[in-house]
From Swiss-Prot:
Gene name, Swiss-Prot/TrEMBL: wecF
GO molecular function terms listed in the Swiss-Prot or TrEMBL record: 4-acetamido-4,6-dideoxy-D-galactose transferase activity; fucosyltransferase activity
Entry similarity comment: Belongs to the glycosyltransferase 56 family.
Localisation per UniProt entry: Cell inner membrane
Annotated source species: Yersinia pestis (strain Pestoides F)
Membrane topology label: Peripheral membrane protein
Protein name, per record: TDP-N-acetylfucosamine:lipid II N-acetylfucosaminyltransferase
GO annotation, cellular component aspect: plasma membrane
């Protein structure tokens, strides 16, 4: 049996730990060790990895060191296969482009930003051109429905399959309907992180225009790190529109259960990023019966429509009665059948890893 090496090529602690936890706690119990055990991870902080005894994790201090190790392994053994979980490591894309890593060695699960081309500088535009060519050379691509449609417009001949990120979810909560108070101001969650792609200030202005100054706004900005200047910009813009009591900015990463409690309080999510991101938060809001606003440029709306989940589009007319109706629809939805919920996404992972390991064509 072919041994897969899983590559987490950038130091993104929150997402990387989610993947490692899923492999250690779930997949290691039901799949061959050759498909799930071996990881190469870029990480400065390695202490959390001690929680994953079922995995063999090789760590590297930065993206460059990891890329050099992957390239060396790929060149030493051309039968080696790598499963890329998201890929934000430029050196690896260039290695695939130049032939240092062969197409048949790479199986790539799209996370979102690794597919889209948001930055505008000349340096990034040149890199995007090279990366786009490289992305047409992998052995197989896995992604959401919307991302697959986007990808296949450029690379229609590359084999591709549906696969969802293993969002951390408690399936026991899926069957519980949470009653929303119909009186009092609404609570709106803005964005899924402190990343500028959330367009927080634009979202705050739109919320103020649509719902006035009395709604409560919660903005999670616990990551990325070293983001104080942008957080302060968002804070000042928010305080110009909402009172201090109605504006809550979360500047620290918070425990998962505390985050769930915050999401339960919300009446609406507001996510206007122009690409696929934040699926984890969207899943959790849906689980709790909270509708959300998305940009039409976010292709994940196609996955939502496929699962009959109501969604509002940024720029469309929106008022509180429409939100309450969407909450009612979500309450009546069979959430246990949603394809990208836990445990439904597990079967897709079994199929993806078997395919990458050559177990079926």
């Amino acid at each position: 049996m072919i041994t897969l090496t899983h590559v987490l090529g950038s130091d993104i602690p929150h997402h990387n730990l989610t993947v490692l936890r899923f492999f250690n706690d779930v997949l290691a119990k039901c799949l061959p060790v050759e498909q799930v055990r071996h990881f190469m991870v870029a990480a400065k902080e390695t202490a959390p990895f001690s929680s994953f005894p079922q995995l063999d994790i090789n760590t590297y201090s930065d993206k460059k060191a990891l890329a050099e190790a992957v390239i060396a392994r790929a060149q030493a053994d051309r039968s080696a296969r790598f499963f890329w979980h998201g890929q934000f490591n430029a050196t690896l894309w260039l290695a695939l482009l130049s032939g240092k890593i062969k197409p048949g060695q790479v199986y790539w699960h799209v996370w979102g930003a690794d597919l889209y081309e948001d930055a505008k500088s000349l340096k990034f535009r040149l890199f995007y051109l090279l990366r786009r060519i490289a992305q047409g050379r992998g052995g197989h691509v896995f992604a959401t429905r919307g991302d697959l449609i986007h990808y296949q417009q450029r690379h229609p001949r590359v084999p591709a399959s549906l696969l969802y990120f293993p969002t951390r979810m408690d399936p026991a909560l899926t069957a519980i309907n949470i009653d929303k108070p119909l009186a009092g101001p609404m609570t709106i969650l803005v964005g899924n992180s402190g990343d500028t792609t959330n367009r927080h200030i634009e979202a705050l202005k739109a919320i103020h225009q649509q719902f006035g100054p009395d709604v409560r706004v919660i903005i999670p900005m616990g990551y990325p790190a070293n983001n104080e200047a942008y957080i302060e910009q968002v804070r000042q813009a928010g305080l110009a529109l909402f009172s201090q009591d109605n504006l809550r900015i979360l500047t620290e990463q918070i425990p998962f259960d505390d985050y769930l409690n915050i999401l339960r309080e919300c009446d609406l999510g507001y996510f206007i990023f122009n690409r696929q991101q934040g699926i984890g938060t969207l899943c959790l809001l849906t689980q709790f019966g909270v509708p959300f606003v998305l940009s039409r440029k976010n292709p994940f709306w196609q996955d939502l429509a496929e699962q009959h989940i109501p969604v509002f589009f940024y720029g469309d007319t929106l008022d509180e009665p429409m939100i309450r109706e969407a909450q009612r629809q979500l309450a009546g939805l069979d959430k246990q059948a949603i394809a990208f919920f836990n445990p439904n996404y597990i079967e897709g992972w079994k199929q993806a890893l078997a395919l990458a390991a050559g177990e079926h064509p």
